[in-house]
Amino acid sequence: MARIAGIDIPRDKRVVISLTYIYGVGKTTAQQILKEAGVSEDTRVRDLTEDELGRIRQAVDQYNTEGDLRREVSLNIKRLIEIGSYRGIRHRRGLPVRGQKTKNNSRTRKGPRKTMANKKK
């Protein structure tokens, strides 16, 4: 396995797919990285030379990935909570942040249902 940005990427997959195993690198970013490094997208990771791996590593280092990106996202959320914005309040309460309805669904953010005792008629 080749190590790029502290992540072991799979050897048997194409390079463009293997790069998506790095947090913060999707398919489009992976294509841009390979274009900058001058490596074909169809190449398998096991067929890469050390020179090509080095160029890919340099290209990936220009992007905000892995721990730095996770830290940035968590600090952004913490900042929203501290300034008391609407989005920060939604984060604090564990509710959807982007305007979704919450009457029926939003189970991912709310967690499992908490059943209430039956109301007497």
Curated annotation (Swiss-Prot):
Gene Ontology terms: cellular component: cytosol; small ribosomal subunit
Biological process (GO), any one: translation
GO molecular function: rRNA binding; structural constituent of ribosome; tRNA binding
PROSITE patterns xref list: RIBOSOMAL_S13_1, RIBOSOMAL_S13_2
Coiled coil: none
Transmembrane region(s): none
Domain of life: Bacteria
Region (Disordered), start-end ranges: 92-121
A Pfam family of this chain: Ribosomal_S13
UniProt keyword list: Ribonucleoprotein, Ribosomal protein, RNA-binding, rRNA-binding, tRNA-binding
InterPro entries tied to this protein: Rbsml_uS13_C, Ribosomal_uS13, Ribosomal_uS13-like_H2TH, Ribosomal_uS13_bac-type, Ribosomal_uS13_CS
Function in brief: Located at the top of the head of the 30S subunit, it contacts several helices of the 16S rRNA. In the 70S ribosome it contacts the 23S rRNA (bridge B1a) and protein L5 of the 50S subunit (bridge B1b), connecting the 2 subunits; these bridges are implicated in subunit movement. Contacts the tRNAs in the A and P-sites.
PANTHER family documented for this protein: 30S RIBOSOMAL PROTEIN S13/40S RIBOSOMAL PROTEIN S18, SMALL RIBOSOMAL SUBUNIT PROTEIN US13M
Sequence similarity: Belongs to the universal ribosomal protein uS13 family.
HAMAP family xref list: Ribosomal_uS13 (MF_01315)
Subunit structure comment from the entry: Part of the 30S ribosomal subunit. Forms a loose heterodimer with protein S19. Forms two bridges to the 50S subunit in the 70S ribosome.
Protein name: Small ribosomal subunit protein uS13
